[in-house]
Amino acid sequence: AAIFLKAAELIAGPYRAKINAATMIAQSKNIHQAEIDAACELIDFLRFNVEFMTQIYADQPKSTSDMWNRLEYRPLEGFVYAITPFNFTAIAANLPASAAMMGNVVIWKPSDSQVFSAKIIIDVFKEAGVPDGVINVVFGDALMVTDTVLASRDFAGVHFTGSTHVFKDIWAKIGMNIHHYKTYPRIVGETGGKDFVVAHPSANVKQVATGIVRGAFEFQGQKCSAASRAYVPQSMWPALKEQLITDTKSMKMGSPEDFGNFITAVIHEGSFDKLASYIDQAKKDADAEIIVGGNYDKSVGYFIEPTII
């Protein structure tokens, strides 16, 4: 526990600017999004995990004057495989760290789009005192690494955050290999969502617009909590439409190195092409109207204009 509390202190102090900068440059987060993720949330994860671990150990069966009862927790018989996403540096650190904190050896496969901040996380853990061989980072082809890991007899658990279909594939492969493992693997996963905003007729129009625009376009909508659809009363729509256009057009787009930019590039070309195809489809669909935005350009970066359809 002391090691990870020290890691939290290192991130809060000497590594704060470095891990924020890595998250901004390599994951294209603006300064605000980087600070609340790579610094604040990661520090909270590490400190809260220690607190929760303490509570777990403190929760013991009752003893009597002539009988002492104690419940001990031990690590799994094997290693935990941590698979982490690009969109939150905090989650990328938390998944391997929480398993290691409970005494497990971890193989950590970061996203290929999060390598820079992953390296800094490992530097922090080493300086804090995590021994060599406890958290083992593996870079490479995700499918190849995962298939190799899941084929090992010593595989004892997976800690995953990512897309639903990938998690289903992993679960299926674990099931196919279940006869091969030493023990029954523990499976923990957090997957994507399709979040929405619902507005009541009594709601304040400006507040609804803020909820939609900020909810949809923070970090270019690249998180499971992003608002990707909205349901609003017809009576509210004329005023809300104008407010949405005003608010969306006020967002500056460009490099995260300019602290005035709210919108930055999407994570990679595959994401850019997917979003551009949706915009193109909307332009061709007679039943769809692009309220604001609708432009994209990858000549100097993977920039998608914030778009409401």
Which residues make up each language-model segment?
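Glycine- and acidic
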Residues: A1-F4, A21-A34, N104-W108, A226-S228
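Long amphipathic alpha-helix in the N-terminal Rossmann-like dinucleotide-binding domain
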Residues: A2-A17, Q27-Y57, D66-L71
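An alpha-helix initiation/capping motif
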Residues: A2-L5, I36-D44, L143, N261, ...
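Rossmann-like NAD(P) dinucleotide-binding subdomain of oxidoreductase/dehydrogenase enzymes
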Residues: G13, M24, M53-Q207
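Short linear capping/connector segments at secondary-structure termini
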Residues: A22-K29, P61-D66, D258-T264
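ALDH superfamily catalytic-core signature
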Residues: V124-G129, A151-R153, G157, T164-I309
